[in-house]
Amino acid sequence: MKSTLSYLLIICSLFTACIGHQEESLLFYVDTRTGTAPSATHTAELFGKNTEEYGQTLPAVLEPNGMNFWTPQTQDTEAKCKAPYYYKDTKIQGFRNSHWIVGGCTQDYGSMTLMPVSGTLKYLPQDRGSLFSHQEETATPAYYSVLLKDYSIFAEMTGRSRSAIFRFTYNQPEDAYLIVNPNSDEGKGYIEIDTIKKQIRGYNPVHRIYQGWGEPAGYNGYFIIEYQNEIEEYGTFRHDSLFAGQRQIADGTGIGAYLRFKIHSEGPILIKAASSFTDMEGAQKNLDTEIPHWDFDRTRQELNSIWEQRLSQVTVQTNNRNDKEKFYGALYRASFLPRTFNDVDGRYPSFSTGHPFRQSANGRNYYEDYSMWDTYRALHPLVNILTPKKAGDMMQSLVDKYEQGGWLPIFPCWNSYTAAMIGDHCISALGDAYIKGIRNFDINKACEGMLRNAFRTPATYEEYKNGMGRRALNSYLKYGYIPLEDSVPEAFHTCEQVSRTLEYAYDDFVLAQVLQKLETSDDYFPDPQKTGLYDTLMIRARYYRNVINPSTGYAQGRYADGSFLTDAGNAFSFTRFITEGAPCHYTSVSYTHLRAHETSAHL
């Protein structure tokens, strides 16, 4: 009874604090769980059964554009289209340093999960999951807490970009365990227990999807866990086999480690964690720099202040609380990606290969995970307005990828080429930033990469297959559109020829504006090869007209001989020549009207 009352007092005090300050703190307009439940929209019913009907968001604790998204876990996989947490799930399996591409349908990578349990040792995620109630969750950008009912453990989490601190209050201190496991679906990874340093260390190898599916990405997600308490028992496990007293284990399905703490009275214990994409030393330095102490409330206040500053960049002039919740919740979700990829000392793995390690210059961050087809229209322009310096660092990171990999990426994720989705929208993002006055990136090197993508195709098939270069560029240049005969086989989204044509036309327009701006700018580095390219690109910017069927007024598939597809009933039907939609409808991108650079054509 005493224990139950203590938890109720903790929860009530937190709730009272929220009520007392809800008009002072913008954080209380943000429920980080929004988007984790299935959508009830008509679009969701038509498209993406069992995957994209979810918002695919996370109730994460993070710094804006931080490395890790610290999230409760209800799904024990890094598989494609499986977010770590779904609102409808009934059991929490632990707390993860997720690198999920929020809002998308890709994969998590390089993550680990830790979980406090009590009583009988249960270590596999599907066995150790605890019932919980959404009424007993607190989910803000800077703090998450929940009562794990099966164990009577009150779990709290806060953190920084690369690190986190947890406070677990055990009701059964004589059987207080901590479970840690790398989340490798490929059965790879390593974990070790260091009882002298009071640490658990390990790594989870990163693997690619889309181009190079299943291949190693060339680097690992390293992690380090630190604890203060003495322990009475430790060991490792692999799937359903437990190895008491063993300090390390490598590879195999479902590996991990466990500790049993030596505590004999009620009260919280503290756990710290950090990660790195370079090495274990990087993870240690990240932890020592970001959370060099054991003060949970201090870290929480630091992250609170960071989010107050972020959210207060925009003032919503309304007394409608629902509108404020929608807006500030959206601003929170617009602060996930791209993510910081470097350690506090500036080191990060090379783009595309993982090695050698690179060093970001002048104290800037190197960013990764650009879901570019989804973000070039609105997210990156928003970053340009709210945080122009960060926007420039994000653009320089794209330039770095070009210099390290040889081609400007199409859809850079998990620090690799992917050729996922369509378009060539790093051009759009770079051009938009430069035209709008962002100057803290190398525009001449960026222009070199943009021109390479716009006019050249990789010399070898292996490079192209690996995701380098614009898809179907040769067809686009030959016909002025991508004909239906070109199925675009070396892409995750094959076909979609009309959508690609429309997207490329806009990219070419943006590149033309950059060239025109550079000719009258102090940034311009004279290059005879650029002469006349503006006119060429402006002609290509009108290629979108080549896939508008004059007899219907809609975008339509076109053959190499110039004839249009004759299916007159396809304007509102899903079709392979349009990306995730139909030529003209209200449930997806209305590609017929994707010509933002010629708005007069809509009239």
Predicted region positions:
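Cytosolic catalytic cores of cyclic-nucleotide second-messenger enzymes
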Residues: 603
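Accessory carbohydrate-recognition regions in carbohydrate-active enzymes
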Residues: 21-380, 384-428, 434-502, 506-520, ...
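Bacterial Sec-dependent N-terminal signal peptides
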Residues: 1-23
